[in-house]
């Protein structure tokens, strides 16, 4: 049994600096086809992928994201929940389907479908020798992204992905993940607080040491401190409103 895929995904890290070398149309097509091969709930295929190589559109999205690698990459993908095609089917159906795709369950199905597709693309790209970085920052201004990409009703932007050849001086590395026993629960969830606290304390030390070594002492924060800072930041609180404006989560 080969460990090729295991070793590939274990060394994954986000790449934020790329060579100025566009992906070929053939590579883009192969990546999208790999994404389409992902599992999809009830064969709904409730997603679409928007491929972007137009420099002005990239620049407009960079203004939303605030990150230079939205422009400086080999290719940019944006992944969206897409029930527009299902809405078109609904126009000629005998049964009202909007109760389904406009529901909270419909949102979950579309988001999961898109995430599975994106991960297929990410792993395939890395197997080809490319680097990738996911871009949740496109949700900083959903209304603006919908305008830039001309998204119709029932289509919602989830995240982007920049892909390209890593720059020569790109020096990213895989970050230590939570301990195996902290994320894998056998048969039922183990919620013992003392065990959870002990495992998180150990992990905090691991992450602090990782940053200390990576930055020559310039960063030493723990994982818990990162989580407090991120989740304590009251950002993107308009998400429910934006989802509903898109025709999603109506019930």
UniProtKB/Swiss-Prot annotation:
The record ties this protein, via NCBIfam families, to: PRK10765.1
Specify the superkingdom: Bacteria
| Family the entry assigns | Belongs to the flavin oxidoreductase frp family.
Q: Which SUPFAM superfamilies match?
A: FMN-dependent nitroreductase-like (SSF55469)
* Enzyme class, broadest EC rank: oxidoreductase
> Is the keyword Chloroplast in the record?
no
| EC number(s) on file | 1.6.-.-
Do you know which Pfam families this protein is assigned to?
Answer: Nitroreductase
Q: Which organism is it from?
A: Staphylococcus aureus (strain MRSA252)
Please give the function described in this protein's UniProt entry.
Reduces FMN, organic nitro compounds and disulfide DTNB. Involved in maintenance of the cellular redox state and the disulfide stress response.
Protein name according to UniProt: NADPH-dependent oxidoreductase
A single GO molecular-function term is:
oxidoreductase activity
Cofactor(s) required, per the database record: FMN
Keyword annotations for this protein? Flavoprotein, FMN, NADP, Oxidoreductase
């Amino acid at each position: 049994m080969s460990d090729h895929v295991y070793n590939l995904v274990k060394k994954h890290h986000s790449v934020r600096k790329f060579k100025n070398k566009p992906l070929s149309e053939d590579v883009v097509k192969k990546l999208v086809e790999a994404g389409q091969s992902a599992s999809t709930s009830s064969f709904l295929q409730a997603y679409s992928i928007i491929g972007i190589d137009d420099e002005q559109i990239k620049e407009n999205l960079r203004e939303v994201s605030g990150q230079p690698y939205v422009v400086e990459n080999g290719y940019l993908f944006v992944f969206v929940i897409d029930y527009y095609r299902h809405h078109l089917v609904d126009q000629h159906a005998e049964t009202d389907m909007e109760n389904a795709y406009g529901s909270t369950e419909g949102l979950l199905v579309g988001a999961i479908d898109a995430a599975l597709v994106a991960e297929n693309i990410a792993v395939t790209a890395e197997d080809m020798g490319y680097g990738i970085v996911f871009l949740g920052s496109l949700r900083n201004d959903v209304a603006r992204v919908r305008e830039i990409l001309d998204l119709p009703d029932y289509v919602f932007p989830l995240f982007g992905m920049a892909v390209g050849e890593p720059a020569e001086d790109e020096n990213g590395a895989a970050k230590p993940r939570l301990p195996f026993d902290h994320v894998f629960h056998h048969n039922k969830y183990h919620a013992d607080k003392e065990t959870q606290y002990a495992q998180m304390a150990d992990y905090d030390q691991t992450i602090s040491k990782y940053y200390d070594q990576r930055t020559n002492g310039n960063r030493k924060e723990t994982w818990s401190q990162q989580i407090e800072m991120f989740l304590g930041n009251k950002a993107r609180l308009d998400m429910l409103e934006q989802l509903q404006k898109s025709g999603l989560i109506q019930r």
